[in-house]
């Protein structure tokens, strides 16, 4: 079942991020970010909960993508589903929920970046209707 992410999801989010994406971020920092981003209309956070156990099995996090060279859309920052439940339609459901929100807001697209080595993710995105339109490198400056 799709629903908004909640404060009680922090442990599950941390576990999913570690197991699926390889990111370690403390529960305290995750809770702080979740509280802040949940109140920001430029961020959209949607979870998928098991209807029987009420355990969070996956989530999508998107931000508004606006520029001087395109109409507004969503940029997916994270789509993560617990490894034990992948292949059951959870990721597809989360993206359908994101599609609905993008259309409700009048956005023209949803975009995402996916690491070069994540071939399984690439196949999934293509299966659910996304196309690869660019190959690029990411540059970052850390303070």
Question: Each PLM stretch: what is its role?
Answer:
Residues 95, 102-114:
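Conserved GNAT acetyl-CoA-binding A-motif
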């Amino acid at each position: 079942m799709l629903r908004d992410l909640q404060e009680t999801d922090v442990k599950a989010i941390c576990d999913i991020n570690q197991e699926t994406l390889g990111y370690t971020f403390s529960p305290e920092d995750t809770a702080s970010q979740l509280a802040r981003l949940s109140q920001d209309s430029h961020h959209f956070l949607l979870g998928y909960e098991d209807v029987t156990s009420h355990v969070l099995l996956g989530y999508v996090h998107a931000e508004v993508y606006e520029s001087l060279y395109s109409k507004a859309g969503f940029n997916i920052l994270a789509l993560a589903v617990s490894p034990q439940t992948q292949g059951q339609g959870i990721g597809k459901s989360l993206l359908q929920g994101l599609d609905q929100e993008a259309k409700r807001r009048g956005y023209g697209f949803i975009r995402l970046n996916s690491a070069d080595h994540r071939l399984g993710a690439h196949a999934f995105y293509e299966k659910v209707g996304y196309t690869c339109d660019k190959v690029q490198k990411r540059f970052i400056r850390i303070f």
